[in-house]
């Protein structure tokens, strides 16, 4: 907490940007590119190198302009989507480097292409740092850093360790789960996972908003799953990994912990780790972990147990998972992403990173408190992690309509199902989180102000709904966009939001280089 305050004060006192990082709006490494005269002199008959080394704003001003608009959106708005974050300049430099040029099917030391000396070094270093970031013994844990994203990583685990149509249990999507855990309705298999495997959900106790572990255990006894997923995308409480481990032991099931949302908190040691209980752990790398867009699969290795004959039995996950990633479901890995991930994992072991994650939790707790004081109903009554899930039903409005108003005033949040919902398209909740704004330096009292902005937006949404003639979402949007008094309220709130957001540092680019600062 104290470190977070100090860092924020430090950022506020910086008058001038660090010029060494940028050169006229482009990243510094662009300044080392060959100039036009070199190519005119050495290769007068070859035209394309000149184009290849030209900066983006010259080659494609349309895309450059879109990027500038996105910079302005990130600077002027409030980013509350809990699965999003602002990655660092150093990570973006690695992701935008020459590491993107290389093909490297296979694994370090066993590639199907030549010229991978430095690619192997980067991937091996990334693996080493991944284990270090989560304080894992390399004799007991291994990691694959090649998965392209979280959903593919989960599917790679299923195909590695399960036979077709074997059984998976996971948290139901309307109760906070994720599509990649095998979601299906009574009439349709929504996720491809549910096509290739048999899936059964466990759910929340709707009276408390917590996972119903007693019912989970009863369902597992009847369903006899081969794998149980402990992970969520909209669950504001901590998982009882010990309880699920005991269920897995009874069913001789694999425990897969999907920590995509919370891996940054786990790395910092500010919430309990799933590694003490899980057989396999997956995570994305771009949420609370604050790296590039990718994923990792951690798996147990070494001695699993000693059998009745006194012989050691070893985990057999490593080869199965590696083969499922490549060549099973992927070709060449994205080496620029792996390189950027290595940088992010190094950052995850620093004191600044722990201070940041502590602040994420403090901000989330304060945000939940402020919302509760304004009469908002939180699923489970609060939060233990980086997110809050607000049930809007007691306000007479749904998440879809509130999301539209939030978007209009430059607050990015997302509609989300809550227990009891019957429609995923018009759900009753709004999901919000603190990682992104905490990266910009927001502290507890700033999230009290964010709660004020949210409350003002909800009141506008309720007013728009009352003035709307039709019952469909498009009718609501039409009123939102056509009513002069409503448009005036929206404009005022948007101005207030922007003026507040603009007080805080930009992340990944410098304000002085922006095209759209007003």
From Swiss-Prot:
Its EC number is 2.1.2.1. Keywords: Mitochondrion, One-carbon metabolism, Pyridoxal phosphate, Transferase, Transit peptide. Its main location: mitochondrion. Pfam families: SHMT (PF00464). The modification N6-(pyridoxal phosphate)lysine is found at residue 287. It is found in: Mitochondrion. Belongs to the SHMT family. NCBIfam families: PRK00011.1. This is Serine hydroxymethyltransferase, mitochondrial. The lineage of its organism: Eukaryota, Viridiplantae, Streptophyta, Embryophyta, Tracheophyta.
């Amino acid at each position: 907490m104290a470190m977070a305050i100090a860092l924020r004060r430090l950022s506020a006192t910086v008058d001038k940007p660090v010029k060494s990082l940028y050169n006229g709006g482009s990243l510094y490494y662009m300044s080392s590119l060959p100039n036009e005269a070199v190519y005119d002199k050495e290769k007068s008959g070859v035209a394309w190198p000149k184009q290849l080394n030209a900066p983006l704003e010259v080659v494609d001003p349309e895309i450059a302009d879109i990027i500038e608009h996105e910079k302005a959106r990130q600077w002027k708005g409030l980013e509350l989507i809990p699965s999003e974050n602002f990655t660092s300049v150093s990570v973006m430099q690695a992701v935008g480097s020459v590491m993107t040029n290389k093909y490297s099917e296979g694994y370090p030391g066993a590639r199907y292409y030549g010229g991978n000396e430095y690619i192997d070094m980067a991937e091996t270093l990334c693996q080493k740092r991944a284990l270090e970031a989560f304080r894992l013994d390399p004799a007991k844990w291994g990691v694959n850093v090649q998965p392209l994203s979280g959903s593919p990583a989960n599917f790679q685990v299923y195909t590695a360790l399960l036979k077709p149509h074997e059984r998976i249990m996971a948290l139901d999507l309307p109760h906070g789960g994720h599509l990649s855990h095998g979601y299906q309705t009574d009439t349709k298999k929504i996720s491809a996972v549910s096509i290739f495997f048999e899936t059964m959900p466990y759910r929340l106790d709707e009276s408390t908003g917590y996972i119903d572990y007693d019912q989970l255990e009863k369902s597992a006894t009847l369903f006899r799953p081969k794998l149980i997923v402990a992970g969520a995308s909209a669950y504001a409480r901590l998982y009882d990994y010990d309880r699920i481990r005991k269920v897995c032991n009874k069913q001789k099931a694999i425990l897969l912990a999907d920590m995509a949302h919370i891996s940054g908190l786990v790395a910092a040691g500010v919430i309990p780790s799933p590694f003490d209980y899980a057989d396999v752990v997956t995570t994305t790398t771009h949420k609370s972990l604050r790296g590039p867009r990718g994923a990792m699969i951690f798996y147990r290795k070494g001695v699993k147990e000693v059998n009745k004959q006194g012989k050691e039995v070893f985990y057999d996950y490593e080869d199965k998972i590696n083969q499922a990633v490549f060549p099973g479901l992927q070709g060449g890995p994205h080496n620029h992403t792996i390189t950027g991930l290595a940088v992010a994992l190094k950052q995850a072991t620093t004191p600044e990173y722990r201070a940041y994650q502590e602040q994420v939790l403090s901000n989330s707790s304060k945000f939940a408190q402020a919302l509760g004081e304004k009469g908002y109903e939180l699923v489970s009554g609060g939060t233990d992690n980086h997110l809050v899930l607000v049930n809007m039903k007691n306000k007479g409005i749904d998440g879809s309509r509130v999301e539209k108003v939030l978007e209009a005033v430059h607050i990015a949040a997302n509609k989300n199902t809550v227990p009891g919902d019957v429609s995923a398209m018009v759900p009753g909740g709004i999901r919000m989180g603190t990682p992104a704004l905490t990266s910009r330096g927001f502290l507890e009292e700033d999230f009290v102000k964010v709660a004020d902005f949210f409350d003002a937006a909800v009141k506008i949404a309720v007013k728009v709904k009352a003035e709307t003639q039709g019952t469909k979402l498009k009718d609501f949007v039409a009123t939102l966009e056509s009513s002069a008094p409503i448009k005036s309220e929206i404009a005022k709130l948007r101005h207030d939001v922007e003026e507040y957001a603009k007080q805080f540092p930009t992340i990944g680019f410098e304000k002085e280089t922006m095209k759209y600062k007003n």
